[in-house]
Amino acid sequence: MSSDPTGRPIETRKLRHLEACLRPESQYQKVKTGLDSVPWPYRALPESNLEEMRLDTVFLGRRLKAPVLIGAMTGGAEKAGVINRNLATAARNLGLGMMLGSQRVMLEHPDAWESFNVREVAPEILLIGNLGAAQFMLGYGAEQARRAVDEVMADALAIHLNPLQEALQRGGDTRWQGVTYRLKQVARELDFPVIIKEVGHGLDAATLRALADGPFAAYDVAGAGGTSWARVEQLVAHGQVHSPDLCELGVPTAQALRQARKTLPGAQLIASGGIRSGLDAARALSLGAEVVAVARPLLEPALDSSEAAEAWLRNFIQELRVALFVGGYRDVREVRGG
């Protein structure tokens, strides 16, 4: 992919991000999600039928066939467009939702729009746009948020929080004072759902408390233990990780979910960050998530084809179904306690 330069710094960086994410060094090396330590029941007499297990879920007012979103990954270059269309096709076929990668490049370079245009292949999926919190401290406002949603015909917008990534990025945006007020201000001007998400270092309790009185529809905890975007940035900049201790910072996914459910008991939560199997998903749902989001494990299949991405997701969903079945559940709602 590095042999396909775009001539634009942002787009070139997006391609390098993809390359870096495929490297094992992009993953947390010491910190784990904590999901392995979440107890899961095993029932030798489950008293249910596997094939009748109900997984359908309503999220942001849309019905999904399973509580699964394709997480935010990429956009802004030709290769990214292929990935996004393959993922959207898989989401369409399976009745899932999808988050786009950061659309800043699309707003600043309109010809990058095509790489985010997935409605041609998936006209009816739940589609979530994406902009960075830092951009709202640098002149972005409700107008740019509306463009990010309207120009790709999305249903909602995720605003991603990535201070550690920005701090370790060459030329990163690190002026964040006043950002909490600014995000609430912008969200109040919008007439579509706004989601707050981390990028893989976790939403902490203090941040959730600070956002609690804002008009946010959901929170993606994006916990530590999967892809470290701090590591990704250092791999892009230096070819290796120069600050390994800093790159291990974050709130592990299981801890982030527990804190979020305690801090915002009525909020809709997305669990992401190191979700690698259907059992991970089941455990995350048991901690209070409404849906889970998966990104990194889908990157290689999506580079191959929509069929490969769909096959990975089918297996993931079947793992979730089996976990619920042997756990004694008959419906995904039961695992959440509702």
UniProtKB/Swiss-Prot annotation:
Paired cysteines (S-S): none
Cofactor(s) in the UniProt record: FMN; NADPH; Mg(2+)
Enzyme Commission (EC) number: 5.3.3.2
Residues binding Mg(2+): E166
Positions that bind substrate: R13, K14, S102, Q103, R104, Q165
Statement: the UniProt record of this protein carries the keyword Chaperone: no
Binding site for FMN: A72, M73, T74, S102, N130, K197, T227, G274, I275, R276, A295, R296
MF terms in GO: FMN binding; isopentenyl-diphosphate delta-isomerase activity; magnesium ion binding; NADPH binding; oxidoreductase activity
Cell compartment(s), UniProt: Cytoplasm
Function noted in UniProt: Involved in the biosynthesis of isoprenoids. Catalyzes the 1,3-allylic rearrangement of the homoallylic substrate isopentenyl (IPP) to its allylic isomer, dimethylallyl diphosphate (DMAPP).
Protein name, per record: Isopentenyl-diphosphate delta-isomerase
Lineage per the UniProt record: Bacteria, Thermotogati, Deinococcota, Deinococci, Deinococcales
